[in-house]
Structure formats: structure tokens, C-alpha cells
Amino acid sequence: MKEKSCGAIVYKKENAELKFLLVHQSNGHYSFPKGHVEEGETELETTLREIKEETNLDVEVDTNFREQISYFVESRNVMKDSVYFVATPITFDLINQEGEITECDWYDHETVKTKIEFADIIEIFEKAYIYIKSIDK
């Protein structure tokens, strides 16, 4: 079986420093907001919907940055593709989704790297960080 999820590395500037949005999932992991693609949805539609559902934020997605990882979820016998974009918030009223998300907050670059547990996600984050720095003149 195969599944696909989409989300984004959401960032903002705070006092000239980049901050990144992480969600703390009820399973104990920190991640960037993302979720399953529903039937008939595009990657962009999924990304916008999931960020809104998980954090209450409306965002502008930059589709010029798109990274994908694939991995096997042994416990469910599923091959999963996760697609990540970068995005900036249009609204700033953070409210975490009850049930799935226990907390959502903004963190600096170094803190994000300590909270994310998976090397492939950190690798995508570093690529996104380089991309964001290149467009943030």
C-alpha cells in the first residue's frame, strides 16, 4: 500500500531572525505541519488545508521549493511519500489542533535541529533553510 502526505516548512522573520513553525504531535514527535492527501486534492491544496487544520494559520506556499522523501512504515506495512514546500504565514493566530497536536510554536534554526528526530527531515530542513536565505535578501 502507498500513502502520500504534504506540508510545509513555515517560516517568519522575528527581529531579523528566521523562526520556523513546529508542531508537537500527540505521538511525541516534533514535525513540520503536514498531512494525508485526500482524494482529488492537489499537493498545494493538501498543504494549505493541513497547515490550517493543525495550526489555524493561513499561509502562502512557495512551490519553487519542493522536496520529497519516501519511507516504509513497518507497523502499517505502508510505503509513504512526504512532500515539503516552504511557506510564510498570512495570519498569525496559532491554535493547535486538539487530539493530534499538543503544541505548535516558532523556533530558531538551531532549536529545530535539536527537536526533529529524523535525519531525512533535518536534511530537507537544511535545504529549505539555504533556499530561504537565498531568497530573503
Residue map of PLM features:
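Conserved N-terminal beta-strand and adjoining loop/helix that marks the start
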Residues: 1-20
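Short connector loops at helix/strand junctions that flank enzyme active sites
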Residues: 3-5, 27, 79-82
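Short, well-ordered beta-strand micro-motif
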Residues: 10-12, 86-88, 108
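Conserved Nudix-box catalytic region and its N-terminal flanking loop in Nudix hydrolases
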Residues: 16-58
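Short helix-loop capping/hinge motifs at secondary-structure junctions, enriched
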Residues: 16-17, 92-95
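Short histidine-centered beta-strand/loop micro-motifs
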Residues: 21, 74-76, 95-98, 115-116
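Nudix hydrolase/Nudix homology domain
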Residues: 29-30, 97-137
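Active-site segment of metal-dependent pyrophosphate-handling enzymes
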Residues: 56-93
